[in-house]
């Protein structure tokens, strides 16, 4: 769920999910359209696509099982849908961590009206 995703993001980046990623670029936050603006925004685009492939549970509300082991996020659900949601969140949190060096504050609170030319998953 979004709370668990936020904890993953903080663990991998040291940043608050709400303050740093909830309204960033064209894809970080609710919904999304346009072309990803940078590597961080692309992490969100890929995450949105991943959620779009999940069947059988609500990705934003479903509580899954995971842990942090040796700096890694480990998803631990037997339920296929919950495991898929966890994997979407895990990959995105790692992606944010890998792209911290290109995070650009100018894309925080970016106007959605500037997001055009939507990419397909």
Curated annotation (Swiss-Prot):
<keyword id="KW-0378">Hydrolase</keyword>
<feature type="binding site">
    <location>
        <position position="31"/>
    </location>
    <ligand>
        <name>Ca(2+)</name>
    </ligand>
</feature>
<protein>
    <recommendedName>
        <fullName>Acidic phospholipase A2 PLA-1</fullName>
        <ecNumber>3.1.1.4</ecNumber>
    </recommendedName>
</protein>
<dbReference type="Pfam" id="PF00068">
    <property type="entry name" value="Phospholip_A2_1"/>
</dbReference>
<feature type="disulfide bond">
    <location>
        <begin position="49"/>
        <end position="121"/>
    </location>
</feature>
<dbReference type="GO" id="GO:0016042">
    <property type="term" value="P:lipid catabolic process"/>
</dbReference>
<feature type="disulfide bond">
    <location>
        <begin position="43"/>
        <end position="95"/>
    </location>
</feature>
<feature type="disulfide bond">
    <location>
        <begin position="75"/>
        <end position="86"/>
    </location>
</feature>
<comment type="function">
    <text>PLA2 catalyzes the calcium-dependent hydrolysis of the 2-acyl groups in 3-sn-phosphoglycerides.</text>
</comment>
<dbReference type="InterPro" id="IPR016090">
    <property type="entry name" value="PLipase_A2_dom"/>
</dbReference>
<dbReference type="InterPro" id="IPR033113">
    <property type="entry name" value="PLipase_A2_His_AS"/>
</dbReference>
<dbReference type="GO" id="GO:0005576">
    <property type="term" value="C:extracellular region"/>
</dbReference>
<keyword id="KW-0479">Metal-binding</keyword>
<feature type="active site">
    <location>
        <position position="89"/>
    </location>
</feature>
<feature type="disulfide bond">
    <location>
        <begin position="50"/>
        <end position="88"/>
    </location>
</feature>
<keyword id="KW-0443">Lipid metabolism</keyword>
<keyword id="KW-0106">Calcium</keyword>
<feature type="disulfide bond">
    <location>
        <begin position="57"/>
        <end position="81"/>
    </location>
</feature>
<feature type="disulfide bond">
    <location>
        <begin position="28"/>
        <end position="44"/>
    </location>
</feature>
<dbReference type="GO" id="GO:0006644">
    <property type="term" value="P:phospholipid metabolic process"/>
</dbReference>
<dbReference type="GO" id="GO:0005543">
    <property type="term" value="F:phospholipid binding"/>
</dbReference>
<keyword id="KW-0442">Lipid degradation</keyword>
<keyword id="KW-0964">Secreted</keyword>
<feature type="disulfide bond">
    <location>
        <begin position="26"/>
        <end position="115"/>
    </location>
</feature>
<feature type="binding site">
    <location>
        <position position="27"/>
    </location>
    <ligand>
        <name>Ca(2+)</name>
    </ligand>
</feature>
<feature type="binding site">
    <location>
        <position position="29"/>
    </location>
    <ligand>
        <name>Ca(2+)</name>
    </ligand>
</feature>
<dbReference type="GO" id="GO:0005509">
    <property type="term" value="F:calcium ion binding"/>
</dbReference>
<feature type="binding site">
    <location>
        <position position="48"/>
    </location>
    <ligand>
        <name>Ca(2+)</name>
    </ligand>
</feature>
<dbReference type="InterPro" id="IPR001211">
    <property type="entry name" value="PLipase_A2"/>
</dbReference>
<dbReference type="InterPro" id="IPR036444">
    <property type="entry name" value="PLipase_A2_dom_sf"/>
</dbReference>
<keyword id="KW-1015">Disulfide bond</keyword>
<dbReference type="GO" id="GO:0050482">
    <property type="term" value="P:arachidonate secretion"/>
</dbReference>
<dbReference type="InterPro" id="IPR033112">
    <property type="entry name" value="PLipase_A2_Asp_AS"/>
</dbReference>
<comment type="similarity">
    <text>Belongs to the phospholipase A2 family. Group II subfamily. D49 sub-subfamily.</text>
</comment>
<dbReference type="GO" id="GO:0047498">
    <property type="term" value="F:calcium-dependent phospholipase A2 activity"/>
</dbReference>
<feature type="active site">
    <location>
        <position position="47"/>
    </location>
</feature>
């Amino acid at each position: 769920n979004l709370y668990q995703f936020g904890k993953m993001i903080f663990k991998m980046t040291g940043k608050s999910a709400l303050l740093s990623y909830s309204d960033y670029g064209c894809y970080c936050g609710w919904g999304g359209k346009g072309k990803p603006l940078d590597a961080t925004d692309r992490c969100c685009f890929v995450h949105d696509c991943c959620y779009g492939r999940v069947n059988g549970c609500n990705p934003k509300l479903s509580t899954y099982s995971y842990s942090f082991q040796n700096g890694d996020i480990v998803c631990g659900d037997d339920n296929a849908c919950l495991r898929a949601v966890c994997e979407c969140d895990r990959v995105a949190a790692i992606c944010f961590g890998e792209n911290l060096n290109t995070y650009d504050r100018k894309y925080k609170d970016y106007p959605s009206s500037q997001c055009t030319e939507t990419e397909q998953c």
